[in-house]
Each structure stands twice: as structure tokens, then as C-alpha cells.
Amino acid sequence: MSEGDSVGDSVHGKPSVVYRFFTRLGQIYQSWLDKSTPHTAVRWVVTLGLSFIYMIRVYLLQGWYIVTYALGIYHLNLFIAFLSPKVDPSLMEDSDDGPSLPTKQNEEFRPFIRRLPEFKFWHAATKGILVAMVCTFFEAFNVPVFWPILVMYFIMLFCITMKRQIKHMIKYRYIPFTHGKRTYKGKEDAGKAFAS
């Protein structure tokens, strides 16, 4: 293999201009993502704003309903992964039918670890909206369809999926919206005298 045959190398062994450009672009993008990580509320407000702009665009153009339906299903899939635990509790159960000895205390604190963390959920949802927005600029993605049917399909799919997810939460007793272990406060200072 000669010097210039490796990926991204020019004839003289240095990275090509195109390779350096895209590497630098990737570094800038990652830097912006890193800076936005602690600003959860701002990130979601921007995503909701993009979603609102997308909905207005689809409403005004009166088309691209298939793209919108696909975006809705993609967001539903992300949301279910966000609500699901990283390790499925149904896989951790013993398959034995007989009695077994307890191995854990019932009150043991187990933090909820998501299958899809919040930042990755936000990032994927935002990218999905941007891709759908780009699709609305191409007539090839404007497939004629009777949109009320898609709305009904999406509502049915949402209800069935969420019902299954809620049953799973109840069965395995986990709540995906806890922020940590509960702390209990003692009684208020009982030594205070009553005002008479």
C-alpha cells in the first residue's frame, strides 16, 4: 500500500482539504453539543419551536403528510425508549415456578437508568425534525394520501403503545420520572414556644 492510499490522505501523506474541512466541522458541531448539554430547558424550547415551525409549514403547504406521519412514529419510538429502563425487568425474573428465597430488600433504592438518555432523546428528536423539514423542500416526498386515515392510525398506535408501556411500569413498579432517592425530614423544632 502506498503512502497516499489511506482514507483522507492526499498524495503527499497530509490529510486532504476536504477531510480537514469535515473533521473541523464535526469538531465545531460536537463543541456546540457539549456547550448545550447543561441547558435542558433551552434545548427543548428550541426543539418545540422547530416542531411548531414544521407543523406550520406542513399546514400551509397542505402536503407531506407521509413525512409527518413517519416523524410522529419516530418520535413515539424515541419516547418509548426514553420511558423504558435500560435493563428490562422481565428478563431479570426467574423462570422457575417454584418458591425462591428473597435476594433483595423491597425498599432497596435502585436508580432508574433509561434505555435512551434525555440528551440523546433530544438530539435524535431535533435531528428528526430537521430531516423532515428538509424533506418538505422536495416534491418527491409529497405522496398524495388521505391524511385523516394517517391521524387515526397514529392515534391508535399511540394509545396501544402507551397502554402497553404503562402496564409494564405498573407490573414492574418503576417510575421513569424520579429524580433520586427520597429524603425524609425530621419533625419541626418542637422546642419553640407557642405565641400566647
From Swiss-Prot:
The chain crosses the membrane at residues 41-61, 63-83, 140-160. GO terms for cellular component: endoplasmic reticulum; Golgi membrane. The modification N-acetylserine is found at residue 2. It is a multi-pass membrane protein. Keywords: Acetylation, Golgi apparatus, Membrane, Phosphoprotein, Transmembrane, Transmembrane helix. Pfam families: Rer1. GO terms for biological process: protein retention in ER lumen; retrograde vesicle-mediated transport, Golgi to endoplasmic reticulum. The modification Phosphoserine is found at residues 2, 6, 10, 95. It is found in: Golgi apparatus membrane. Involved in the retrieval of endoplasmic reticulum membrane proteins from the early Golgi compartment. Belongs to the RER1 family. This is Protein RER1. The gene is RER1.
